[in-house]
């Protein structure tokens, strides 16, 4: 996807939140179990300028895996308790980093290279984290497919067959 955390800091948080979510039909554990049954896995990560979404698995389970992944992205349901736990862990990690010599040196290096406004200071504040809602983050997840993106495929399907299968469940903007 041609969007990253430098475009919107909440996107990275939403992507991290996805792994804790279920849908209107499945709990988070059931989603995990379904992907396991299909011998597939997925992931979403956010860099500064781009985000990456991947789905790995067996060719024989391609249709079902894509369908399940699309279902997860389009129907993820907010879980405020999981969000609170995730935010608490993020704040704890930040506090722990204040005691880590390597992290301190990295922040100091960024300050020396870039000045007061640098990559080490570009994150959501504690107040912003406390105010964010699960509903707001799930909107980011629901909209992932709406961003301009490219699809890379490695497998036995011919391009025409792949296009037909993906077109049935996925829209490319």
Predicted regions and their residues:
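An aromatic/glycine/proline-enriched structural segment found at the starts
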Residues: 120, 147-173
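Short, charged, amphipathic alpha-helices and their helix-cap/turn boundaries
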Residues: 129-133
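A common structural junction motif
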Residues: 71-80, 167-173
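M16 family metallopeptidases and their MPP-like homologs
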Residues: 1-19, 23-75, 86-95, 100-128, ...
